[in-house]
């Protein structure tokens, strides 16, 4: 989907340094100082307009959340939701997922969320998918031994691709649902895309996985 460019987005984000972290590389290994506590850190890669990450931060004050979205014109919408949520455990970062190791130390992130990521359907774009082994290698370094990846999508092809990619990477699949909203899963917080697609009758796919390090 084409994103409308907002030339004022960067300046708007920088008006709120308590929420928007302009230079996340400066805090690699020191995110506890940013939040002022030792609570676990969960990140959402591709946080879009921020409904999910703001909802999670509000529902779980004992966890620190960082929403990561590389497009500032999109992230500025997440900023508005963060301001409205008015929670101390949420920060926003504008970075490409390929650069995450520049922002976080090994094992510094307790959990990763991938919600409605771009499916990149063309074969030549496979490596751009956030569940591609190239990215799994990055996630493995960021997560501790017990760390998990939680993935949601409405795209069955991407979900099937991800199941195979995770399995071939020798990850342990701890939860799989082919119709999340009609399952027994509790505590789901919807994204904007999730509300849109589920309202049209599309099933939502979800999986949870962790790296097998035994």
UniProtKB/Swiss-Prot annotation:
A GO MF label: tRNA (guanine(46)-N7)-methyltransferase activity
Active-site residues annotated for this sequence: 118
Catalytic activity: guanosine(46) in tRNA + S-adenosyl-L-methionine = N(7)-methylguanosine(46) in tRNA + S-adenosyl-L-homocysteine
One Pfam family hit: Methyltransf_4
Highest taxon, organism lineage: Bacteria
Enzyme category, top tier: transferase
Keyword terms: Methyltransferase, S-adenosyl-L-methionine, Transferase, tRNA processing
One GO CC annotation: tRNA methyltransferase complex
Residue sites binding substrate per the record: 122, 154, 191-194
Binding residues annotated for S-adenosyl-L-methionine, in chain numbering: 44, 69, 96, 118
Function, in words: Catalyzes the formation of N(7)-methylguanine at position 46 (m7G46) in tRNA.
Family according to the record: Belongs to the class I-like SAM-binding methyltransferase superfamily. TrmB family.
Protein name according to UniProt: tRNA (guanine-N(7)-)-methyltransferase
Species per Swiss-Prot/TrEMBL record: Listeria monocytogenes serotype 4a (strain HCC23)
Taxonomic placement: Bacteria, Bacillati, Bacillota, Bacilli, Bacillales
Gene name, Swiss-Prot/TrEMBL: trmB
